[in-house]
Amino acid sequence: MDIAVLRAEQIATEGKVIRHDDFAFSQPGLIAGADVGFEQGGEVTRAAIALLRFPSLELVEFQVARVTTTMPYIPGFLSFREYPALLAAWDKLGHRPDLLLVDGHGISHPRRLGVASHFGLLVDTPTIGVAKRRLCGKFAPLAEAQGALAPLMDKGEQLAWVWRSKLRCNPLFISTGHRVGLASALHWVQLCMRGYRLPEPTRWADAVASNRTAFKRWQQEREEADFFPPQ
């Protein structure tokens, strides 16, 4: 794997990312969350996309794709490893979201091309990065209170918002992915909260990917609704 080639591709691709609001909706009808993980010791890449109706944030569709991992883990180049599975899950969706939240960084990346920006650009959809750990940049000490907020800065440029979404939890790093400015990114993430650390779209994507209790319960409720239709 030629790191110099990947770095050059990152730099060239980053220039195509749109960092301001570029969407027609005043309120999205459908919001998706995307999450990527690895199975079988990293040999298989698994991507899950959960599609939610807005503003109710009700799960209406999900897709999971598993593909053979074609690239080793290289710090700073994770998006190249993850996007093939994300594209496979995206292609299976029956509906297209108006807005996409990706578990990972957008422009808050050393070369400004995290997975949220890379994937958002590939599918040309307004995209927000919601990361759980800092990748680059610095921020002022954050208050312990829920809602505490600080800009993540790098070389004089704001890359993300550092936001404590839940009391006694580590903050999230919310960044532009593609076609969504920083102010709007924070706004839409805040509107997708329902008392957990993560916004509902990425929380549901994780639940789908990991077959968590919430997702099992949702499946059971759907099965019961199909078996006992309303009179």
Curated annotation (Swiss-Prot):
UniProt-listed Enzyme Commission number(s): 3.1.21.7
Catalytic activity: Endonucleolytic cleavage at apurinic or apyrimidinic sites to products with a 5'-phosphate
Subcellular location per the Swiss-Prot or TrEMBL entry: Cytoplasm
GO molecular function, one term: deoxyribonuclease V activity
Keyword match Metal-binding: yes
Marked site positions, Interaction with target DNA: Y73
Superkingdom classification of source: Bacteria
GO biological processes: DNA repair
Cofactor requirement: Mg(2+)
Keyword NADP in annotation: no
GO CC annotations, alphabetized: cytoplasm
Binding sites annotated in the UniProt record for Mg(2+): D35, D103
InterPro entries (alphabetical): Endonuclease-V
Keywords, ordered alphabetically: Cytoplasm, DNA damage, DNA repair, Endonuclease, Hydrolase, Magnesium, Metal-binding, Nuclease
HAMAP family membership: Endonuclease_5 (MF_00801)
Listed NCBIfam families: PRK11617.1 (NF008629)
Function: DNA repair enzyme involved in the repair of deaminated bases. Selectively cleaves double-stranded DNA at the second phosphodiester bond 3' to a deoxyinosine leaving behind the intact lesion on the nicked DNA.
Family statement: Belongs to the endonuclease V family.
This protein's name: Endonuclease V
